[in-house]
Swiss-Prot record:
Taxonomic superkingdom: Viruses
Biological role stated in the UniProt entry: Contributes to virulence in host but not to replication in cell culture.
Keyword match 4Fe-4S: no
Chief location: virion
Protein keywords: Host cytoplasm, Late protein, Virion
A single cellular component GO annotation: host cell cytoplasm
Species whose genome carries this gene: Monkeypox virus
Top-level taxonomy: Viruses, Varidnaviria, Bamfordvirae, Nucleocytoviricota, Pokkesviricetes
UniProt-recorded name of the protein: Protein OPG091
Miscellaneous: Displays sequence similarity with a group of bacterial permuted NlpC/P60 proteins. Thus, the ancestor of the OPG091 gene might have been acquired from a bacterial source at the onset of poxvirus evolution.
Location relative to the cell: Virion; Host cytoplasm
Family per record: Belongs to the orthopoxvirus OPG091 family.
Length: 165
């Protein structure tokens, strides 16, 4: 199953979606293992949506299909607490329009996810890089509170039984 259909079928609101693209303006400067992340907002007017922060557009909401245009690989993670995930998804909308960057009043993709979950009561550790606290994909994927439910590089990994309860 491709990641878009998997997310539409199984992923709860607030799931975090890591993707790698064939071409990225920032991939060579990014020490993160996974190069981009977004929060699955869920559906609105029958459209599946993702909130992300990009170099050119800052924090924005895009259709799930567009989020995956040109992707090479994808992973989807969730928490056990679905209510917390819904709060984080709702929080993501309050950050729309913030410009991209690493300053106090700026937002890059991993910081977006960390901020949304911080406001939902889930703190994320950061890495100290060049005197700044920076969030990377590893801060989520190495945290055992996050459960990987999809990996496009390991399609036998799906934890659909976990999602069904």
């Amino acid at each position: 199953m491709d990641p878009v259909n998997f997310i539409k079928t199984y992923a709860p609101r607030g799931s975090i979606i890591f993707i790698n693209y064939a071409m990225s303006l920032t991939s060579h400067l990014n020490p993160s293992i996974e190069k981009h992340v977004g929060i699955y907002y869920g559906t609105l007017l029958s459209e599946h949506l993702v909130v992300e922060s990009t170099y050119r557009k800052g924090v924005r909401i895009v259709p799930l299909d567009r989020f995956f245009e040109g992707y090479l690989s994808a992973k989807v993670y969730m928490l056990e607490n679905i209510q917390v995930m819904k709060i984080a998804a709702d929080m993501s909308l309050t950050l729309l329009g913030i410009p991209y960057g690493f300053g106090h009043d700026r937002m890059y993709c991993f910081k977006l996810v960390a901020e949304c979950y911080k406001n939902a009561g889930i703190d994320t550790s950061s890495k100290r890089i060049l005197g700044k606290d920076i969030f990377l994909s590893q801060n989520f994927t190495d945290d055992n509170r996050w459960i990987k439910i999809y990996d496009s590089n390991n399609l036998t990994f799906w934890q659909i039984d976990y999602l069904k309860g």
